[in-house]
Amino acid sequence: CYLFTATQQLDESLDVLLGMVTHPYFTEQTIAKEQGIIGQEIKMYDDSPDWRLITGLFECLYHEHPIRSDIAGTCESIAAITPEMLYDCCKAFYAPGNMVLAAAGNTSMEQILAACARHGLMDERPAEKVERLLRPEPMTLAAAEKTIAMPIAKSCFGLGFKEEPLPFGDLRSEMLYELILCCICGGMSPLYRRLYDEGLTNPGFGGEVLRVDGCCCILFTGESDRPDTVRQLLLDEIERVRKEGVDREIFTLCKNEKYGQLIENLENVEDSASQMADFALAGQTVAQQI
């Protein structure tokens, strides 16, 4: 996703953006420069406890899915990148049928369409058919647990649950996952208050749902000196909710909070544009999601 904001010269800025994605330019020299920068970023992430925790969870949850691999690659893999490889990727993916251009603010549809026309994005052209070849992924776990030793003040921990992949455009199920997580361990839940009051976790403890093509999982992460205790309390709460259901009052609060967040994003120009693009790529509109 490419983002920019502008207070003036919007047409010129759009021309730079659309020119970049429609007519990319790669050389051995520019690639070598970026390889050095990305290599430093990879090493930086290797020193991040939070990042190592998440990648460790993915390695435990999945046997074959590409989510096991660090999205940035490795210093060895990026060293093999060539201009021809990047041009092939652009030809396959940087096609109008795969693009979403979202704009918010003091502009008009006519101005945006004119920018697209200047770069040939309004011309009819056959779409490149790209098929992602994913290896079969069993629903079993690749590993039950993993420990990573790092020199940090307080230990990070994560607990993951592997779920069946969601169909494309099924934002309703994703929203239900988020509401259930809010009811189980959100800031208004009894479990969150207990863990925080007893000093078992940090304020950043929480759960999230992650879904990509062929992958869906629930992740709980935080900091704790007693991760095994937190894990058991979390499992006990999940089992209680399975048997008794969610508290109606907490569910209403969580639903209103989520609704409020969606509305609040419409008050911010940058958030509005990002939200429109995200939902469009998922096959829906902001209005449908709300």
Model-derived regions, located:
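Double-stranded RNA-binding/processing signature
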Residues: 134, 138
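Short glycine/threonine-rich loop/turn motifs
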Residues: 171
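Short gly/ser/thr-rich secondary-structure transition/capping motifs
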Residues: 84, 140-141
